[in-house]
């Protein structure tokens, strides 16, 4: 995309419902919604089977049941959704620090200066979606474009579990055919008002002028005019830099010796280096090893460190494993802690 920005919009597919279907296989092939089932309750979301009956988010549960009598409604598990969202955010951070979360299930990523995947935003989006599926057994859709507006529109083009790329040379053609219904900020009433004046697609707006649009939609006219030309100059609103980096693996079978744990750490260390690459300007201040035992209790041993040292992880493992009390190990993890701001004079050192 040359000097253009490379923005990815990731949108999880029916996030809450997908988690319920993942955790409870009996829900996988039935119409499912998450929300309350009382007479005044509304739905948070629904799966694609339910959507075929017209069931939608924010719909009263009683209406949803009328549309789909065999709809299964389950109460949400917000703690699980938040933890899963945190895991997804960790996957994003492997590729860029420039992340703007919009909700638990969607975010913008700026990968303009990313070096992974040869700097290809398309490949990065594919890798992120693959990581989410392989590690969390959930699917996500993605839009890749030169700005936030187009990336968000694009992420909806090939849902579910797909992605759409709008390169700079395709922007004009893509936007020209775009229905005004798809522009954020245009609800049914505004669209109806525009429609009455002959505006149906962005092409219609492009042939008009801001003054004429102001007479119809007021202050929104300028934004509408720019978006109809594919222009959106907003930067990502990055809330804060990550304070740590972690990688862990839940083992297929519990292991029962320190040497077996060391082999796992050797493997995790190489993956940690890969994930560390996008954060090479951050100053490391801490290393840690985490073990979770057969009984699901866990322990973490940390120490101060200004570089990522494999030998130090092995030393920390020895201390952590001494707390096992003959319990098997089911999870092994490595952590790095960062200083609050990037070190200006100190370059990150990687001891291989």
Swiss-Prot record:
Cofactor binding summary note: Binds 2 magnesium ions per subunit.
Active site annotation, chain numbering: 106
Site (Substrate discrimination): 16
Principal location class: cytoplasm
Domain UmuC as annotated: residue spans: 7-187
Residue ranges crossing the lipid bilayer per the database entry: none
CDD domains attached to this UniProt entry: PolY_Pol_IV_kappa
Enzyme Commission (EC) number: 2.7.7.7
Names of required cofactors: Mg(2+)
GO molecular function, one term: magnesium ion binding
Alphabetically ordered keywords of this record: Cytoplasm, DNA damage, DNA repair, DNA replication, DNA-binding, DNA-directed DNA polymerase, Magnesium, Metal-binding, Mutator protein, Nucleotidyltransferase, Transferase
Binding residues for Mg(2+): 11, 105
Catalyses which reaction(s): DNA(n) + a 2'-deoxyribonucleoside 5'-triphosphate = DNA(n+1) + diphosphate
One GO BP annotation of this record: SOS response
Keyword Metal-binding among UniProt keywords: yes
Disulfide linkage: none
GO cellular component, one term: cytosol
Location of this chain's protein in the cell: Cytoplasm
InterPro entries: DNA/RNA_pol_sf, DNA_pol_Y-fam_lit_finger_sf, DNA_pol_Y-fam_little_finger, DNA_polymerase-Y, DNApol_IV, IMS_HHH_1, Rev_trsase/Diguanyl_cyclase, UmuC
HAMAP family named in the record: DNApol_IV
Function: Poorly processive, error-prone DNA polymerase involved in untargeted mutagenesis. Copies undamaged DNA at stalled replication forks, which arise in vivo from mismatched or misaligned primer ends. These misaligned primers can be extended by PolIV. Exhibits no 3'-5' exonuclease (proofreading) activity. May be involved in translesional synthesis, in conjunction with the beta clamp from PolIII.
Record family assignment: Belongs to the DNA polymerase type-Y family.
Oligomeric and partner information: Monomer.
Stated name of the protein: DNA polymerase IV
